[in-house]
Amino acid sequence: VRAIASAFALRGLDPLPALQAAQIAPDLLHQPDARITALQMEWLSASAMRELDDEALGWFRRRLPWGSYGMLVRASLTAPTLGVALARWCRHHGLLTDDIRLQVSQSQGVASLQLTEQRELGALQEFAVVSVLRNALGVACWLTDSRIPLLHTTLRFAPPPHADSYRVLFDGPTQFNAPTHSLQFDAGYLNLPVRRDEAALQRMLQRALLLTVRP
């Protein structure tokens, strides 16, 4: 929530309307241990993305206008398998911003989705990295109509004060202060067929943030 408020500040805008739309009291911004519900986070993110016209919420030097991530999913929809779909998603993400690079690889039966920072993300590092990885995982699960359990998550930053919440964000163990940002899962999932079509995409886009915001 504080990171989203910072995105408004960077644009010289007031986050209060977005906070009110999500029924979040502004004084929670000053309470380090404050918590909100997944639904409130969904409402806040949607309001902020529309008002800022930036689905990246200030993470990158270039704005990602409303609809950018939907476009990425649509470009992957015709892929025969999840492996091809994720490779497309990562490549096309690089056309939107070169501040980060995404890559899918596999070795010894383990698939890895790796995020590399190509410039310092500063105070928004955690928010950006977690959001992009969560979105990619959500897209992968949605495309295959499957739940993809994680074997391991690695993150370059130190454990934040709310590190316990990572048990909800990512399955399996999470390693902080790691050499790379990555999600690791059984490589067999890369062979799953893509099971969604344009009609399913249109329905999903009505509440696309559910792919990222995990209840």
Language model features with spans:
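N-terminal low-complexity or simple alpha-helical regulatory segments
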Residues: V1-Q114, N135, P160-H162
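Hydrophobic, well-ordered secondary-structure segments
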Residues: L86, V129-A140
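A generic structural signal for well-ordered coil/turn residues at beta-strand boundaries
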Residues: D98, G109, P149, F170, ...
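A short interface-forming secondary-structure element
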Residues: Q114-F127
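Juxtamembrane segments at transmembrane-helix boundaries
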Residues: R119, V139-R147
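Short, charged, low-complexity patches
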Residues: Q125-V129, L133, E198, Q202
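Beta-rich nucleic-acid/ligand-interaction surfaces
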Residues: I148-Y166
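Extended mid-to-C-terminal alpha-helical interaction segments
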Residues: S165-P215
